[in-house]
């Protein structure tokens, strides 16, 4: 029984030494790679910024909830103005443009001639004013009701 405990203690000591060596070599690699990162680039993707403050995920300028740039395109953001999720002009929730098309979704601007993925949930006299956000949402059949 004592020999098993001694063997386990020896294995633990070897594991501890190996992990310390790996951590030390990882620290030197990280310090070398930090020199190549520009200080103004922060966040998810490229072109500066972060989740809630400038830049964007895969575009440039703007962010998730702020302004300028967007997820995959340019100009605007997820909930703020200008641009949209995949394109340009308008935004996801607030007027002008739309999620993947043109002309507005969830807050003004009309549908711009493109379709609503889950149907139209509010139809005005000039066509669809608000697309459904999920398939089970109630669909309005009469304009203005």
From Swiss-Prot:
Q: Where are the sequence repeats?
A: 59-65, 66-72, 73-79, 80-86, 87-93, 94-100
Q: Which InterPro entries match?
A: GRP (IPR010800), GRP_receptor_kinase_reg (IPR053373)
The record's region (6 X 7 AA tandem repeats of G-G-G-G-[NR]-Y-Q) falls at: 37-113
- Region (Disordered) residue spans: 28-51
Subunit-structure text? Interacts (via Cys-rich C-terminus) with WAK1 (via the extracellular domain). Component of a 500 kDa complex, composed of GRP3 or GRP3-S, WAK1 and KAPP.
> Into which family does the record put it?
Belongs to the GRP family.
Question: This chain belongs to which protein, by name?
Answer: Glycine-rich protein 3
Query: What lineage does the source organism belong to?
Result: Eukaryota, Viridiplantae, Streptophyta, Embryophyta, Tracheophyta
Q: Which gene encodes it?
A: GRP3
């Amino acid at each position: 029984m004592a020999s098993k405990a001694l063997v386990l203690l020896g294995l633990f000591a070897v594991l501890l030494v190996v992990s310390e060596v790996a951590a030390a070599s990882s620290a030197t690699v990280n310090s070398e790679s930090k020199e190549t990162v520009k200080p103004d680039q922060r966040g998810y993707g490229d072109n500066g910024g972060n989740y809630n403050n400038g830049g964007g995920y895969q575009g440039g300028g703007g962010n998730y909830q702020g302004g300028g740039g967007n997820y995959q395109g340019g100009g605007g953001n997820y909930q703020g103005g200008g641009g949209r999720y995949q394109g340009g002009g308008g935004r996801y929730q607030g007027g002008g443009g739309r999620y993947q098309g043109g002309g507005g979704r969830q807050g003004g601007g009309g549908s711009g001639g493109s379709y609503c993925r889950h149907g139209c949930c509010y139809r005005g006299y000039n066509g669809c004013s608000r697309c459904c956000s999920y398939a089970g949402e109630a669909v309005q059949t009469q304009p203005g009701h």
